[in-house]
């Protein structure tokens, strides 16, 4: 969740403090602390990304999306914020916009497993099964020990009538 280039002015103690609150599920307290830090260090993409994650955890998806958008507007090459925005847009039902955001994350970081994985899920939701298959295959190429990707790929291949390939992916998921 941290990127040392983004929060170079923030102290490690400040960063650790808000991450500890987030990790402990104390999202509102984390938001309060981040707002204070944001006043001290305005336009820090890391802070907007983290507050977006807090809002998302609280189920405040619209607010979450706005924070992730702010982060990527400040730092257009912030792959994690693009990925987070994509996931949130998917959760909001804005699937085409989600694909765009996830693809931006991948353009910045081509082997970004989480972005490829969420892109595959979004393609499936769009019923673009061939694209979903390709995305899961990329996930597996980059991380061959991602059991859920094999399982999900198996489900897609089964739906596409490719039973033998589906079985191979299920077996691989079980092996892992």
List where the protein language model places each region.
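Alpha-helical segment of the N-proximal tetratricopeptide repeat
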Residues: 10-40, 53, 57
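TPR-adjacent "capping" and linker segments in tetratricopeptide-repeat scaffold/adaptor proteins
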Residues: 1-13
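Conserved alpha-helical positions within TPR/SEL1-like repeat arrays
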Residues: 15, 19, 46-57, 80-91, ...
């Amino acid at each position: 969740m941290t990127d040392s280039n983004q929060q170079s002015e923030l102290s490690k103690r400040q960063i650790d403090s808000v991450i500890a609150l987030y990790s402990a599920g104390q999202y509102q307290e984390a938001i309060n602390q981040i707002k204070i830090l944001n006043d001290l260090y305005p336009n820090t993409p890391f802070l907007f990304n983290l507050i977006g994650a807090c809002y998302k955890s609280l189920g405040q998806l619209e607010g979450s999306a706005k924070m992730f958008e702010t982060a990527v507007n400040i730092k257009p090459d912030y792959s994690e914020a693009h990925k987070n925005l994509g996931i949130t847009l998917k959760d909001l039902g804005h699937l085409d916009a989600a694909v765009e955001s996830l693809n931006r994350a991948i353009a910045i970081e081509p082997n970004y497993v989480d972005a490829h994985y969420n892109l595959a899920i979004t393609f499936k939701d769009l019923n673009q099964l061939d694209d979903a298959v390709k995305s899961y295959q990329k996930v597996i190429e980059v991380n061959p020990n991602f059991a859920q990707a094999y399982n999900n790929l198996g489900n897609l291949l089964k739906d596409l009538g490719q039973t033998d390939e589906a079985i191979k992916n299920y077996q691989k998921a079980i092996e892992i």
